[in-house]
Amino acid sequence: MVTIIEDNTDFEYLKNSLKDSDSFWSPVYSDAYKHYTCNALSFIYIYTIKTELEFILPFRHTDCLNQDIERLKEVTSQGDIFVLAKKRFGKFYSGKCYDADLMAWWQTHQMLQLTETNTVAHDIWNRWWHNETNTNDWLPITRHIERCTHTRKEFMKSYATFEMTPEFRQYDAYAIDNFFAIEQNGLHVDAKLYTEKFQSNGIHNGKVFTEYNLYTSTGRPSNKFGGVNYAALNKEDGCRESFVSRHEHGMLLELDYDAFHVRLIANMIGFDLPDVSIHEYFGKQYFDTDTLSKEQYEQSKQITFRLLYGGIDKDFAKIPFFGEVKNYVSSLWKAYKRYGFIKTEQFKRPMYAEHLHEMNPNKLFNYQLQAGETEHNLHTINNVNEMIQSYKSKLILYTYDSLLFDYNLDDGKQFLIDLKNTISENGKYPVKIKAGINYHGMKDVTSRTA
């Protein structure tokens, strides 16, 4: 039986039931299609795992005596709270909790499988009222409970085999909390240009909002919302012109890693690369020359990436760096075949053979590299979000090798210096800096921060 919280007695019963029990929370938002930054919280379905109690804590639903959402901060637990889509829930709740999808993904490389949890009532309701807003507030609460019960059962399948670790706790904090911070900032747009380029009207107070999917097979986040793929915005068709600064005295600023993967790999295998152009360094070894032509420099880039992603043959394995990479790939594959899993470098996330398909040594290495890239960047984003608190500028977009900022010119040159040092780790991972009045045709300004 589900208890719907309607008065103080019910509310105290909920709080006492949660005190020492792990629990599963499934928030339901008023509108099924709005970005969570522009949405409201209809109610929360709460399940206490120790005592198997079910609650509905309502805030806007028409079937219930709704509670003041400010009371949500009173609901805490000494047990672990697992929230469905915690990143979205961060707008409403700042208490300690963990992401239920991340828990499932940590074990299987997939988020909770909820494709079949919609009830017939949900499907019919969404067809009838697809042009209306906030329909979850008036879809019958009994139908919501039916759906939440299905969701809880899927969660419990993953919970039954999950082991909480310090690494998971840290990954949850770094990944969920930091990407929540980026999503909250949004991207300011020229409304006319944006609507023209994307045929979308998802603009709220002059901004559009991204949503990062953290549950990909390798861990590298994808980034889509409202039909727009923000991780792969076209550089040629002018669509990037629609992204502009929100500040009266502002511009967009992009910091882009230089030869990022090569340096990450060097760090993984413990190889010291010189503090020079990576492609020039390798090109001189490829072509046995002291001076590279422009054509040889471009060829050097292609050769390096072909070797790292396609496999290293015997001739190139004679170059010390690539010989070490080849040994690392071989050792990684042997461990994978022997134990049936490997762990990522920093957060020790397991990657099990049963969940990785058609694997081979180079593909496994690429999985490990992309996981390592993401874990490195989580530390970087966390450091950036801490550093940026004292400035007016905002971090507004992340891709695997670059960060985009809405730069307030009042922050001055010191912001650029602090930012460059934070992202590059004081030069360990060199970055290039570009700036512009919009996200299209940005100019290199790296030398101005030297």
Predicted feature residues:
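Acidic, glycine-rich two-metal-ion catalytic cores of nucleic acid-processing enzymes
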Residues: 2-3, 26-67, 191-294, 345-388, ...
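Conserved DEDDh/DEDDy metal-dependent 3′-5′ exonuclease domain
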Residues: 2-13, 19-162, 259
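Short glycine-rich phosphate-binding loop at a beta-alpha junction
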Residues: 77-89, 256, 314, 397, ...
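Helical catalytic core of nucleic-acid polymerases
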Residues: 90-166, 175-185, 226-361
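Generic structural signal for residues in well-ordered beta-strands
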Residues: 94-97, 395, 431-433
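Short Gly/Ser/Thr- and Asp/Glu-enriched loop/turn motifs at secondary-structure junctions
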Residues: 99, 173, 193, 299-301, ...
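C-terminal polymerase-core module
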Residues: 311-318, 325-370, 406, 410-450
